[in-house]
Structure formats: C-alpha cells, structure tokens
Design a protein with these regions (language model features):
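A structural signal for short, well-ordered beta-strand segments and their strand-loop junctions
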Residues: 51-52, 127-130
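A short acidic/basic microdomain associated with nuclease active sites
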Residues: 47-60
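A structured, charge-rich N-terminal accessory region that forms the first stable segment of a protein
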Residues: 25, 29-40, 48-50
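C-terminal interaction segment
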Residues: 1-25, 38-39, 57-70, 77-97, ...
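Generic preference for hydrophobic
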Residues: 51, 72-74
Length: 197
C-alpha cells in the first residue's frame, strides 16, 4: 500500500491593522497627529508618496509581532493613498520621515526603542513633538540619519526637513510647516477655510 503525504501550503501570517488601543493619549496629541497628517497629505498631493497615521509599520516578513505604529509617517516612491497597514517588504520603501507625538509617559519608548528601530530601518528623519511641553522644553526636535557605516541619528539644528523640503517649528500645540523654496506656511484646515472665505 502506498501512502501519499500531502504537505499543506505555507500559511501566510496574519498582519493585523488594529490593536484596540487609543489613537492618542490626550486631545492635544490627537489634534497634533491629525493636523500633521492632513497638512502633509495636502502638501504631497500629486507626488509619488503617501502619508499614514497611527498605522502598523511591519518591518520583518513572517513575523507579524515585529511592528510599530508611528504617529505619522511619510513614504516616498510608493503609490499615493491610504493603506490598512504598511509592510516594508511589499512596498519596497522604508518611511523617509516619522513623527511621534510624545509625552512624559511615552518618552522612554520614543527615545529608546523607537529611535533605535528607526535608525536601524534607515528612516532618514525622526521628529519628536511634545504638544504639552512635558519633557521637551522646545517642544519639537528632529534627528537626521548620518551617512556612516553604523546608522546613527544626529540632532537637526536648523529645523529643516530635507526629505520634505520644509522648515518645521513648534507653534503652540501644533507643528508649523514652511516651504523652504518660498517661506510660505502650509495652512492647517481651519486657516485654509478662513483664507478661502
């Protein structure tokens, strides 16, 4: 008697899109996240880029637990539009810029695990914004990946984002974005509505 052994096809792991956790710690953090997301989304309309907010970034194929959820991430050289989550190996691009809306309670994770992870992934710039000024006196600070054998972040001292071609500055509980080529401020939705009246 011959016995056939049938092997089952490999099972693709499930990559969840949600974790059941709140989007942000406080209203100020949520507002800063949503405004940053929308301002950058509008700024990059027509570009080969996407801006995602509080969605899982999967960085190791086959290991769905190896993930993080940046508050805002900008990825260039990909199809524009939303996604339920972002898998680096499917898209072929690492985020160029990541923003974390940080607080005293997320400080250690934002300064430790996330900063190290983003360095290792090759994220060009990492910005931390503390809308309540709980631990970053100047509220906003950025780090740029250095072109060295070992990926390392160095502080951005001029407030300029090279990938975005914008100057960033803290403006109360939001980040102000200014074009490097014209100096023009990118308007938030409320400012845009007033300007259109």
């Amino acid at each position: 008697m011959t016995v056939l052994t049938v092997s089952s096809p490999p099972i693709e792991p499930v990559y969840p899109s949600g974790d059941g956790e709140p989007v942000a710690e406080t209203f100020d953090h949520l507002y800063a996240l949503l405004i940053t997301l929308e301002v950058l989304r509008q700024y990059l309309v027509g570009e080969q880029a996407t801006v995602l907010g509080n969605q899982y970034l999967y960085y190791a194929q086959g290991y769905p637990r190896l993930r993080t959820a940046p508050d805002v991430m900008v990825i260039f050289k990909v199809e524009p539009g939303g996604r339920d989550n972002y898998k680096i190996w499917e898209e072929g691009q690492v985020p160029s810029v990541i923003f974390e809306m940080t607080s005293a309670s997320t400080r250690d994770q934002d300064q430790g695990f996330k900063r190290t992870l983003y360095e290792q992934l090759g994220v060009q710039e990492y910005w931390q914004f503390d809308p309540k000024g709980e631990w970053i006196a100047e509220q906003l600070r950025g780090f740029r990946l250095q072109n060295t054998p070992e990926p390392t972040y160095a502080p951005i001292t001029d407030g300029q984002s090279q990938p975005l071609q914008l100057r960033l500055q803290a403006e109360g509980r939001l980040i102000g974005f200014y074009r490097l080529d014209t100096g023009e401020k990118l308007l938030i939705p409320e400012e845009l509505a007033i300007a259109l009246r």
